[in-house]
Amino acid sequence: MLKVGILGSTGSVGSQALDVIRKYKDQIKVELLGASKLSENLINQIKEFKPSYVYVENAEEKSIDDIKVLVGEDGLRRAVNLDLDLFINAIAGIKGILPTYLLLKYNKTLATANKEAIICLGELLKDKYKKILPIDSEHSAIFQILKDSNQKEVRRIILTASGGPFVNMPAEDFENITVKQALIHPRWSMGKKITIDSATLMNKGLEVIEAHYLFSMPYEKIDVLIHPESIIHGMVEFVDGTVISNMSNPDMKIPISYALFYPERKFLSDNYLDFTKIKSLNFLKPDTEKFPLLKLAVECGKKGGVYPTVLTVADEIAVNYFLEERIKFTDIHKIILETLEKFDYNKLDSVDDIFYIIDKTINLATEIAKKYGST
């Protein structure tokens, strides 16, 4: 019986992980569920899966139905120290950084969809990344292709992007994009923050940085292509000209299942590709004039140091302001760029430095976002 813990169980990825586990309750025991608050959704999950422990960021309860409730940072440290076979970090955004750090520090096997943690922890924990099973569809695709390959044989890896809802919209119309429009993703069902990042192509830029660390791949060997059908999730081109791709219908449960049962594969549904119904597979170079955040993210990745962390945190602040309808869609790029230009701290020698940089960036980006919100 595989013993699993899920942090962020009430979010999009966490909920889909539980959907997979429901099919294999005879093989998987959920020992830990975690969320930011003791919501009705979490309580229903507790009743169904009956974990031994529950982690909640903020709560007064000490137990629920005789299940131990772990609260706050002390509770988190206890949760990640549990003797489990696999932890899934499905926490969205920068809140997922501390759990990732602790899990890697304690040498736990980690399946993660939290790219922010990989990007911010960067070089400091790169020797630990071999313990990670990626859940992002693109990184899972590359992971599956590369696992039996020698990196010297790789010419480049290619991450695909749907292009988001605005790939065919004229740039001059971007200023009037609404939150409702930006949250309608053409292919994937995801959380709000990552859906906005997909609309700006920031998500793909962050994925380039993540791929650099996860696969020890030079930036010069990482390419991005717009692929509107979202059938091919990633490709690896080898030095002999061979290209191997990972293809499936767009469904997050597939990479989640692969991480859960690695190295085995399990039946999920009859939602197989019907190649006779695929009329075409299209690939385009991303327009970085129209979507400048993709280019900015890659530039920050190449610079290294504090830049990837500042970029990541500033993006989260700006996206939240947009989701609250306090700024325009086009202000997201402006806020991130101004935060990067005004950030004045360069020391990055320890994990403590990372958390200091995060706090400092939150304050600076919030101050800048408020300025745009008042115009």
UniProtKB/Swiss-Prot annotation:
Entry EC number(s): 1.1.1.267
Binding-site residues, NADPH: 10-13, 37, 114, 116, 191
Cofactor(s) essential for the protein: Mg(2+); Mn(2+)
Gene3D superfamilies: 1.10.1740.10, NAD(P)-binding Rossmann-like Domain
GO biological process terms on file: isopentenyl diphosphate biosynthetic process, methylerythritol 4-phosphate pathway involved in terpenoid biosynthetic process
Binding-site residues, 1-deoxy-D-xylulose 5-phosphate: 115, 137-138, 162, 185, 198, 203-204, 207
Function: Catalyzes the NADPH-dependent rearrangement and reduction of 1-deoxy-D-xylulose-5-phosphate (DXP) to 2-C-methyl-D-erythritol 4-phosphate (MEP).
Protein name per UniProt: 1-deoxy-D-xylulose 5-phosphate reductoisomerase
Organism: Sulfurihydrogenibium sp. (strain YO3AOP1)
